[in-house]
């Protein structure tokens, strides 16, 4: 039995389209670095797009191992962790500055508050931070004033 030429063409075209759509394509093996260099001049950016030479990419599909294959990640936390928390906020120094303003208080500020809120706890030679703030004792002067005394 003879198959018409038109049917063969349609069959071949359908085969090529189906087979071609299932192929994902070959990944790119060549790459090029690109960057933008700008020299601002007043209100203008004066940018130039530059391209580096092309180079071959290495095949990284074989370099990817199973999850958690890295022995450093599997060890867990280090046993010889040294905390610099004891040195935090201590020391001496000098400085200069200028400004104007007025205020009152005992001098406790941001660093003192941080030391109250983040107290280290030592469990089996590993330093963890307890992020639950302690109850603060507000014994400083002018801390417990009612809102009626505020001047807006």
Curated annotation (Swiss-Prot):
Residues carrying sugar: 92, 94, 98, 100, 102, 104, 106, 108
Say if the entry is tagged with keyword Iron: no
* Cysteines paired by S-S bonds: 38-47
Domain of life according to the entry: Eukaryota
Q: What induces it?
A: By phorbol myristate acetate in T-lymphocytes. This induction is not inhibited by cyclosporine.
Sequence ranges of the sequence repeats: 89-90, 91-92, 93-94, 95-96, 97-98, 99-100, 101-102, 103-104, 105-106, 107-108
Effect of disrupting the coding gene: Mice develop normally and are fertile but display mast cell granule and T-lymphocyte secretory granule defects. Granules are more amorphous than in the wild-type and show a less defined dense core formation. There is a lack of mast cell-specific protease activity although mRNAs for a variety of proteases are detected and storage of granzyme B is affected in T-lymphocytes. Neutrophil granules display a lack of neutrophil elastase and processing of MMP2 is abrogated. Macrophages show no major morphological defects.
Q: Which residues form the propeptide?
A: 26-74
Give the span(s) annotated as 10 X 2 AA tandem repeats of G-S: 89-108
Task: Decide whether keyword Transmembrane is in the record.
Answer: no
Post-translational modification comment from the UniProt entry: O-glycosylated; contains chondroitin sulfate and heparan sulfate.
One Gene Ontology term, aspect cellular component: cytolytic granule
Region described as Disordered: spans on this chain: 66-115
> What Pfam families has UniProt attached to this entry?
Serglycin (PF04360)
Where is this chain compositionally biased, Gly residues type?
90-110
Its keywords, alphabetically, are: Apoptosis, Biomineralization, Disulfide bond, Glycoprotein, Golgi apparatus, Lysosome, Proteoglycan, Repeat, Secreted, Signal
Question: In which family does this protein belong, per the annotation?
Answer: Belongs to the serglycin family.
- Cite the record's note on assembly: Binds to activated CD44 and to GZMB.
Q: What is this protein called?
A: Serglycin
